């Protein structure tokens, strides 16, 4: 197991180096939240680009103070250059203008604010934006379109959340980050498990079977139930996948019109 993950680290570092170079960049930037996924991406980027990998810390008005502390501790441990921009003034303005906004709307606004800061920094510093969404999130559509899902390159987009945990262990990510419940930290009390209804330890095996069995054909409910998955779980996950599949697609553009 250790040997496999050491090989994976080498593979992902090589991927980052080659893909960034292909796009004509020497520097990268990414959002560092204090959570697991961005910590893993941050350490991978630091291994490859050293001082040319820059983290942006962008706490909102509802971010947990410990998220910022965990991000700062990671930067200190791995000598990661960072800049901190508070998005609190902007999300407060949104809240004052849209007092009836749901938590999802407020969360999406914060996610898109962060991506705006990342791409502004990208332009200012001639850096490429690196993504931090894992495969579980991507398959479920558990992310904000043109928010945290937006990036030029994503080294962990084909790793399920449970695999990111294992990779983090071999990258020596602090236990404080490894052990805390996953959360997008977009509103008070939020957690991935509350949003999704299940922990990743339950979701990921199902996602792996869905990918293996139904890559080129429609997902079949009964087949998955016969494998031992609870019907309510399967229905919930299939619904999320189908409802949010558009988030992984490029915009649909009308074909050029050729009048006869």
Swiss-Prot record:
Pathway: Cofactor biosynthesis; NAD(+) biosynthesis; NAD(+) from deamido-NAD(+) (ammonia route): step 1/1
One of the protein's GO biological processes: NAD biosynthetic process
Binding site for Mg(2+): 37, 137
Enzyme superclass (EC): ligase
Annotated GO CC locations: cytoplasm
Pfam families, sorted: NAD_synthase
Ligand binding (deamido-NAD(+)): 112
UniProt binding sites for ATP: 31-38, 132, 161, 183
E.C. number: 6.3.1.5
Alphabetic keyword roster: ATP-binding, Ligase, Magnesium, Metal-binding, NAD, Nucleotide-binding
Catalytic activity: deamido-NAD(+) + NH4(+) + ATP = AMP + diphosphate + NAD(+) + H(+)
Gene3D superfamilies given in the database record: HUPs (3.40.50.620)
Domain of life according to the entry: Bacteria
GO MF terms held by the record: ATP binding; glutaminase activity; metal ion binding; NAD+ synthase (glutamine-hydrolyzing) activity; NAD+ synthase activity
Transmembrane segments: none
The protein's role, per its UniProt record: Catalyzes the ATP-dependent amidation of deamido-NAD to form NAD. Uses ammonia as a nitrogen source.
NCBIfam families: nadE, PRK13980.1
Family (UniProt): Belongs to the NAD synthetase family.
Subunit composition and interactions: Homodimer.
Protein name: NH(3)-dependent NAD(+) synthetase
Species the sequence originates in: Helicobacter pylori (strain J99 / ATCC 700824) (Campylobacter pylori J99)
Lineage: Bacteria, Pseudomonadati, Campylobacterota, Epsilonproteobacteria, Campylobacterales
Gene name per UniProt: nadE
